[in-house]
Every structure is written in structure tokens, then in C-alpha cells.
């Protein structure tokens, strides 16, 4: 019987399935950070247990770490305690850990693939909703809660219910200036933030196959924003070439056997999906979110929607509330929206490809006078090193953009990087909820190139026109 990629990944990790469908799944890789792990380790201690499989765990501090000079440590006492607790747990249990001063440190969903800790065919979990990122490698990857973090530490398994399967098929050549971020925002704009609820999404089609691994990670990263449990992309040569030679990748005959298996990680011809959604890449334009949900998004040449034209009363009410919070009026051209800050970073868009795209836009230009701050936060110390070897840091600095240390930063404002009330930000992150980047802050989700262009012009602009 023809199987989907999701079927294959699920079935290969089933330990036991109960009469009600509840399944014990084996977990290959467990990623941990400082925010959702302290209570899990405390539970482990109280029960007198130790991690079942030490080598399956990889820990890093990312949410609370400062992106400015780290010589003086972390100023905020709560943030400092979380990171110190992570340090202590890593040492007590002998788990692999990239501390704040380790050059391999970075955002957990950047360092996993970078180190080869994420490999095709794995089940990958983390106490973080954007764990779906790792599905780009043909993995079954999703976020878990703190109690589940403890369960995985103790048993290397997870209780789960199988989701339905959705196929998002994107075909055609991607227009100039349109990126993976624009694809996934367009998908969410089409199906809504609840469109993927109850599903695991496979992203496929000629457009997806043409993307780099960085682009595929961007798309899978935001599968959760469509409501999906997981997002994934089939394995191909691009996948295999990316993981080859990574520190934790197999070598020698183990590599050969792994590749043979990895090449089976695709949906079979004739495999049945519960829902199929199609997009024509040629019709996708650079996207800009205007509201307080990722589904509130339009093309850069569009206008802020008018709630009066929305027939669904619930959606209309949400739109009206979003416009009030965002201080926008219906029918305002997107290109008339002025910004105060720019944030280029996050687990969505902080990899080397993202930084190159942003640098290409700002090269030889300078930040607009009304933009108070434009910051670039690499996804890891290794991404930062590579960018500096390529001279990208100098391009950003010359354009008036700040070059920072790696971390989650302004994506969720748990460290000192945040918006002040009323400030408006062009952000390459994944969530534009109320207060996400700071109390009263207003977030617009865009691609790295679009964020860079807004920083130069002081308002949203079609990056395709700016390039020319």
C-alpha cells in the first residue's frame, strides 16, 4: 500500500499502540533550552531518575542570552537563573551542552541541523513550538510541553496520537525577490492559522524541491503557525548534501547505509492525503503581515483589508481588534506603513542564506532616519563566523545596522531586545501576536530582504523595485 512520508516516519517509530489509538513513539533526538527544561529536570530529580539515553540530548541556551557584549553575563535575574539552571543540569547529567560562550551556541533550531544532530528519518522533539523546523530534513519533528520533556528524558519515548496528512503542493518558478518566507506566509494566508489543525503537513512540488535547506527550514518552521502538528519535506540530494560532513553525521559504511535508507523518505506515488492544498509559485508576491496573527497577511502591493468586507462575524471582529492594536486604517497601502525598528533573526530567518539576502539589499545604502534601530542577530556563533568571513557584518554596520551575538532576541523579547509600546517593527520572525516583541509593540512579518528594504526606506517597499 502506498504510504505518505508521514506514514513512514510514524510507523518506523511506533513502540506500541493502544486500543484508543494512543501510541508510544520512540524519540531519536531531544533538543533542550533554558525556558522549558528546568521543571522537567526537577521532576526527574524528585523521582530519582536519570536520562534514559544521554547521547540523544542536545542542550543550548538561546531564549534569554544577551545579543550584546556577554563579558558581564546576564543582567536580568530571572533570565540569569534560567541559564544557570540549564548549565547545572547539563553538568549534573553529563548532557551535551553549548554554553553562552561556546562558539557553537545559537538558536536551538539552527544548531541542531548545523551540527548534524538533526538527520533524515528521525523523530525530533523539543520544548518549543517551532521544532517543526527540523521536518525540512524528512523528520517527524514537533514541540512538546514541559511534562513531556521530563517523559522523554526519562523514557526516550512520547505518548502521541497520529494526525491526519495534508499535502501543500507548490509548483512553478519562484519570481525574483520572492522567498521561502513569502511562500509560507502565502500558505498561511490561504488556509488560515487553524487550517492545519489536526494535520501533519508535507510541503512538496517543484518550487519546494528548488529551495535550499535554509528555505525548507523556514517553511517547516512556520507550519505550526498554520495550526499543524508538524511540517516536513521529502529527502533528496539537497538534503543529503547538507548533512554530509556535519559533526554528528554518520561516516564511512554507516553513511552509505544511512543514505540508502534516507532515499526512501518520500511519499509513494499514489499515496493518499486527507487534504491537498495547491499554490502557483508564479502568483506569490513578497508578503507583509498587517495584523496580530500570521494569517493576517497580504502582498506588498496590496492594502490593509477592510473588516466591513468580511462576511464571517468572528473574523470581522478579529480584524477590527487587530486594526486597533496595530493602529492601522482599512485600505491603507502597505507601502505607506512606516516602521520604527527592524529585526533580522529568529529560528525562521537567521541562517547564512538569510543574512546574505539582507546584506545584498543594504549594500551601499544607509538606514532611514526614522528607523531607530535595525539589528541583525545571526542564528548561531558558526553562522556569525561565516558571515564575518564573507564580510557581511561590515556591510550591515556600514548601512547603520547593528551586528549582534546569536540568540532568539527580539523574536519574543525575553532578553533586553524588545519593542517599546507603540513601536512598529519589520521582523523576520514567525509570530506577530500582541506584545510578542514587547508590550504594546507592533510586529509585521516579512522576509529578510523585505525587512532590510524597509530599514533603508523607512517604510515597507517592494524589494523587487528596490533591487532594480
From Swiss-Prot:
Entry's cofactor comment: Binds 1 [4Fe-4S] cluster per subunit.
Catalysed conversion reaction: (2R,3S)-3-isopropylmalate = (2S)-2-isopropylmalate
SUPFAM superfamilies attached to this UniProt entry: Aconitase iron-sulfur domain
Pathway assigned to this chain's UniProt record: Amino-acid biosynthesis; L-leucine biosynthesis; L-leucine from 3-methyl-2-oxobutanoate: step 2/4
InterPro entries xrefs: 3-IsopropMal_deHydase_lsu, Acnase/IPM_dHydase_lsu_aba_1/3, Acoase/IPM_deHydtase_lsu_aba, Aconitase_4Fe-4S_BS, Aconitase_4Fe-4S_dom, IPM_dehydratase_rel_enz, IPMI_cat
EC number: 4.2.1.33
GO molecular function: 3-isopropylmalate dehydratase activity; 4 iron, 4 sulfur cluster binding; metal ion binding
Names of required cofactors: [4Fe-4S] cluster
Domain of life: Bacteria
Top-level EC class as recorded in UniProt: lyase
Biological process terms in GO annotation: L-leucine biosynthetic process
Matches recorded under Pfam families: Aconitase
Keywords, in A-Z order: 4Fe-4S, Amino-acid biosynthesis, Branched-chain amino acid biosynthesis, Iron, Iron-sulfur, Leucine biosynthesis, Lyase, Metal-binding
Segments passing through the bilayer: none
Keyword Cell division attached: no
Subunit-structure text: Heterodimer of LeuC and LeuD.
Function as written in the Swiss-Prot or TrEMBL entry: Catalyzes the isomerization between 2-isopropylmalate and 3-isopropylmalate, via the formation of 2-isopropylmaleate.
PANTHER family reported for this sequence: 3-ISOPROPYLMALATE DEHYDRATASE, HOMOACONITASE, MITOCHONDRIAL-RELATED
Family in the record: Belongs to the aconitase/IPM isomerase family. LeuC type 1 subfamily.
Stated name of the protein: 3-isopropylmalate dehydratase large subunit
Organism: Janthinobacterium sp. (strain Marseille)
Gene symbol of the encoding locus: leuC
Amino acid at each position: 500500500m502506498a504510504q505518505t512520508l508521514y506514514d513512514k516516519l510514524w510507523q518506523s517509530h511506533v513502540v506500541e499502540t493502544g486500543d484508543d489509538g494512543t501510541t508510544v513513539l520512540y524519540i531519536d533526538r531531544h533538543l533542550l533550552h533554558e525556558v522549558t527544561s528546568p521543571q522537567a529536570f526537577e521532576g526527574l530529580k524528585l523521582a530519582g531518575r536519570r536520562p534514559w539515553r544521554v547521547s540523544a540530548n542536545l542542550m543550548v541556551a538561546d531564549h534569554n542570552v544577551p545579543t550584546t557584549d556577554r563579558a558581564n553575563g546576564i543582567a536580568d535575574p530571572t533570565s540569569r537563573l534560567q541559564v544557570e539552571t540549564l548549565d547545572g543540569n547539563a553538568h549534573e547529567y553529563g548532557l551535551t551542552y553549548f554554553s553562552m560562550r561556546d562558539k557553537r551556541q545559537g538558536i536551538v533550531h539552527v544548531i541542531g541541523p548545523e551540527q548534524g544532530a538533526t538527520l533524515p528519518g528521525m523523530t525530533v522533539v523539543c520544548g518549543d513550538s517551532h521544532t517543526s523546523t527540523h521536518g525540512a530534513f524528512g523528520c517527524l519533528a514537533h514541540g512538546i510541553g514541559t511534562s513531556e520533556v521530563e517523559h522523554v528524558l526519562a523514557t526516550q519515548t512520547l505518548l502521541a496520537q497520529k494526525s491526519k496528512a495534508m499535502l501543500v503542493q507548490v509548483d512553478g518558478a519562484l519570481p525574483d525577490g520572492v522567498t521561502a518566507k513569502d511562500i509560507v506566509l502565502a500558505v498561511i494566508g490561504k488556509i488560515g492559522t487553524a487550517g492545519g489543525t489536526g494535520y501533519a503537513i508535507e510541503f512538496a512540488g517543484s518550487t519546494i524541491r528548488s529551495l535550499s535547506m535554509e528555505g525548507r527550514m523556514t517553511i517547516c518552521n512556520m507550519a505550526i503557525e498554520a495550526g499543524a502538528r508538524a511540517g516536513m519535506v521529502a529527502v533528496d540530494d539537497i538534503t543529503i548534501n547538507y548533512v554530509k560532513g556535519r559533526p554528528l553525521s554518520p561516516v564511512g559504511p554507516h553513511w552509505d547505509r544511512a543514505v540508502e535508507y534516507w532515499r526512501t523518505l518520500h511519499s509513494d506515488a499514489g499515496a493518499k492525503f486527507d487534504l491537498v492544498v495547491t499554490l502557483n509559485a508564479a502568483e506569490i508576491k513578497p508578503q507583509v503581515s498587517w495584523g496580530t496573527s500570521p494569517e493576517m497577511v497580504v502582498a506588498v502591493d496590496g492594502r490593509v483589508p477592510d473588516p466591513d468586507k468580511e462576511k464571517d462575524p468572528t473574523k470581522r471582529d478579529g480584524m477590527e481588534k487587530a486594526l486597533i492594536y496595530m493602529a492601522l486604517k482599512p485600505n491603507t497601502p502597505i507601502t505607506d506603513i512606516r516602521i520604527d525598528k527592524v529585526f533580522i533573526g529568529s529560528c525562521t530567518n537567521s541562517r547564512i542564506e538569510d543574512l546574505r539576502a539582507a546584506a545584498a539589499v543594504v549594500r551601499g545604502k544607509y538606514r532611514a532616519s526614522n528607523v531607530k534601530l535595525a539589528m541583525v542577530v545571526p542564528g548561531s556563533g558558526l553562522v556569525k563566523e561565516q558571515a564575518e568571513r564573507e564580510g557581511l557584518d561590515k556591510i550591515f554596520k556600514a548601512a547603520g545596522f547593528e551586528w549582534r551575538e546569536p540568540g532568539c532576541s527580539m523574536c519574543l523579547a525575553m532578553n533586553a531586545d524588545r519593542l517599546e509600546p507603540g513601536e512598529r517593527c519589520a521582523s523576520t520572525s514567525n509570530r506577530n501576536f500582541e506584545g510578542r516583541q514587547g508590550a504594546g509593540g507592533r510586529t509585521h512579518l516579512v522576509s529578510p530582504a523585505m525587512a532590510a528594504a524597509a530599514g533603508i526606506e523607512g517604510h515597507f517597499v517592494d524589494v523587487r523595485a528596490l533591487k532594480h
